[in-house]
């Protein structure tokens, strides 16, 4: 559904309009790889070093790693209107400072997009709604795994429609902003 380009379109319009963007990164450090238990997807992410970083206080090995930003997003994330929160560890923002940053900057409305619809995006939506935020989701600026008998994207769309204040397309958000 053109997720990567649609997320870029959201970054672009936010930059043009001076809208603050909050990025909730997913990082694992060495100590995270020694957990006594984990879910099947966590096991996979750890095995393929999907979001691994050398440490919280170093950029060593970050460039080009699974934790690095997509090249087309770097010019936006390095911009003045972007706040990168502390990392989340599983799927939602319960383990980072996203809600704190939103509140401290005076935001009560969130337009949510992200790479993993039924995991990180949905978990962020649920937690932010439960924390009192007015959350809308951009349904074509997120995607999910589709496997035999498992359609993560369709599952997420059902929950977006049931929980979010509004479900937009990228085109609708760009026009609305």
Show where each model-derived region lies.
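Short beta-strand segments at enzyme active-site cores
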Residues: 19-26, 138
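Histidine-centered active-site/metal-ligand motif
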Residues: 26-28, 124
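A short, N-terminal amphipathic alpha-helix
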Residues: 2-20
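Active-site-adjacent betaalpha module
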Residues: 13-17, 34-35, 40-177
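Short catalytic/ligand-binding loop motif for oxyanion handling, primarily in non-cytosolic enzymes
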Residues: 29-33
């Amino acid at each position: 559904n053109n997720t990567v380009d649609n997320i870029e379109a959201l970054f672009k319009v936010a930059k043009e309009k001076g809208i603050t963007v909050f990025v909730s990164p997913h990082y694992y450090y060495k100590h995270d790889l020694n957990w006594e238990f984990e879910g099947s997807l966590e096991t996979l992410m750890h095995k393929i070093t999907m979001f691994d970083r050398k440490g919280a206080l170093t950029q060593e090995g970050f460039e080009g790693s699974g934790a690095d930003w997509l090249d087309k997003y770097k010019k936006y994330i390095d911009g003045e209107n972007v706040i990168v929160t502390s990392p989340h560890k599983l799927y939602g923002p319960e383990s980072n400072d996203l809600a704190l940053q939103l509140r401290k900057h005076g935001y009560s409305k969130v337009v949510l997009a992200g790479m993993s619809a039924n995991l990180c995006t949905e978990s962020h939506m649920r937690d932010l709604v439960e924390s009192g935020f007015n959350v809308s989701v951009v349904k074509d600026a997120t995607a999910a795994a589709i496997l035999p008998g498992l359609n993560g994207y369709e599952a997420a769309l059902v929950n977006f429609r049931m929980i979010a204040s509004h479900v937009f397309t990228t085109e609708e958000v760009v026009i609305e902003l």
